Amino acid sequence: MISLKSIVDKLYNLEDLSYQESYQLFDYFIKGQIELPLQTSILIALKLKKETSIEIAAAVEALFDNTKEFPKIKGDLAGIVGTGGDGFNTINISTTAAIVAATAGYKVAKHGGRSVSSKSGSFDLLESFGVNIELAPDQTKQCLELYNMGFLFAPFYSDGFRHIKEARTILKTRTIFNILGPLINPARPNKVVIGVYSKDLILPMAKTLVNLGIDRAVVVYGSGLDEVAIHDDTYVAEIQNNQIIEYKVSPVDFGIYTYAIKDLEGGLPEQNREIIKQILLGKGKEAHNAAVAVNVAMLMRLYDKDDLKQNTQEVLEIIKSGKCFNTLQQVINYSNK
């Protein structure tokens, strides 16, 4: 076993960790074997050094090895998720996009927790709608099979996350756990859209996904947002056949207008709930509908639907039909049986 002191000394010297060292470090983290002051020091050292794809992949495996098993789903399974921490407090676009994608016929496993850095995290929103977020894995699997939608509440699958919650709250900044969050979905989706909070993270995240053997994925950075942007360019790294292809898209590539970032500002859970409800009912504002649609359109690329404009129009029609709220309502009802 590698000693914690030797790992910490390397980090204080801003040296990269080996796969084994990173695995051991995050095993210590998740088992609560690191005191709070040292936790904060380690997280800051990693941030200053900049995390490598090897360190991230090793951390993911350590966290998976300390996570409850989720039953395997037949066929493709999608994930739409952001790292959080972009600082803009926009409405819950990835959560809404997941519900819309499920309505469009794609099985989506949404994994996350309550807010650490934003005003309203994905599971804050879901609870405000009345979703029972603490379903057992077999119940969540059945919900996925019935309604194409399943919510996996992170602390339910690994209670070790309680050991690092205080450090993350104290630091009030993005840490490696923002990066790890999208990668440790216990349902292990094979087609994922991951938004990152920094352009510098696109390639490390993409390389990590390749190292983890993910089938198809896109990593996106939307000019300040951890999702596909409707206010400016989105930088993309797409993974296919273990190859990483980098490119850039803009709102015109999706066939939509360019909006202002302030058009997407969210608020407290109750305010976000009402905004999201209107979108799902087909009564949302154009900017809100567009923001959700472009993210689902990007997911559809992973299913060999390459025409982003056509994808966006298909999704907008589904949103405007109001059927998406029915999907959420079915999940709410199922989760409270």
Curated annotation (Swiss-Prot):
Anthranilate 2 binds at residue 168. 5-phospho-alpha-D-ribose 1-diphosphate binds at residues 82, 85-86, 90, 92-95, 110-118, 122. Anthranilate 1 binds at residue 82. Its EC number is 2.4.2.18. GO terms for cellular component: cytosol. GO terms for molecular function: anthranilate phosphoribosyltransferase activity; magnesium ion binding. Binds 2 magnesium ions per monomer. It catalyses: N-(5-phospho-beta-D-ribosyl)anthranilate + diphosphate = 5-phospho-alpha-D-ribose 1-diphosphate + anthranilate. Keywords: Amino-acid biosynthesis, Aromatic amino acid biosynthesis, Glycosyltransferase, Magnesium, Metal-binding, Transferase, Tryptophan biosynthesis. This is Anthranilate phosphoribosyltransferase. The lineage of its organism: Bacteria, Pseudomonadati, Pseudomonadota, Gammaproteobacteria, Thiotrichales.
